[in-house]
């Protein structure tokens, strides 16, 4: 029974980002999507037109756009896919962090709820996604450094926090 319970929540977490947004009665915020797509497109060609506080996100988004262009994937679908991949990564890392302290019966429903909130908020690779990626990865290395008493992990944590 416990295995079926875990399997149900894991499947639910995996399906939430894959659901089409139109079925949730949300519209796409064209202004933010257009702003971010242009930032990603122009970050390598015209740095004067990019918003410098989002420099790292622009570099990541520009690299992703180049990869999607090579693979002939439409840019918007590619950025939604990148968002889903980052969300899966964040859920996996959160699970790895919390599994030492809590049981699966509490962690998996909380992660599914967090995934629903993330899907309702925005389902496109933007600065919030990049910041969450960097912050949680840094937190993971920091907790590993403190708990396992490995000072080398502090270097990785500080790199992601910067």
Residue ranges of predicted features:
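Membrane-interface alpha helices of multi-pass inner-membrane proteins
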Residues: 152-162
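Membrane-interface starts of transmembrane alpha-helices
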Residues: 70-82, 105-108, 153
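Transmembrane-helix motifs of polytopic, lipid-linked glycan transferases
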Residues: 81-101, 137
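Transmembrane-helix signature of polytopic, membrane-embedded enzymes
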Residues: 92-116, 149-152
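Short acidic/glycine- and proline-prone juxtamembrane loop motifs at membrane-interface regions
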Residues: 122-132
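Transmembrane signal-anchor helices characteristic of membrane glycosylation enzymes that use polyprenol
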Residues: 3-30
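Extracytoplasmic catalytic/substrate-binding loops of multi-pass membrane glycan-assembly enzymes
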Residues: 21-39, 46-64, 70
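Specific aromatic-rich, kink-prone transmembrane helix
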Residues: 130-148, 161
């Amino acid at each position: 029974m416990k295995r079926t319970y875990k399997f149900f929540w894991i499947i639910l977490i995996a399906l939430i980002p894959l659901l089409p947004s139109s079925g949730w009665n949300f519209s796409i915020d064209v202004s933010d999507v257009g702003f971010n797509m242009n930032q990603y497109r122009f970050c390598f060609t015209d740095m004067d037109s990019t918003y410098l506080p989002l420099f790292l996100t622009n570099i990541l988004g520009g690299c992703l756009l180049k990869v999607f262009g090579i693979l002939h994937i439409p840019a918007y679908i590619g950025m939604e896919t990148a968002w889903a991949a980052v969300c899966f990564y964040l859920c996996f890392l959160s699970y790895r962090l919390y599994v030492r302290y809590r049981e699966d019966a509490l962690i998996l429903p909380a992660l599914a709820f967090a995934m629903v909130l993330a899907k309702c908020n925005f389902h496109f690779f933007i600065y919030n996604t990049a910041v969450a990626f960097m912050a949680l990865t840094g937190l993971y290395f920091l907790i590993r450094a403190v708990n396992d008493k490995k000072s080398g992990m502090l270097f990785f944590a500080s790199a992601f926090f910067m």
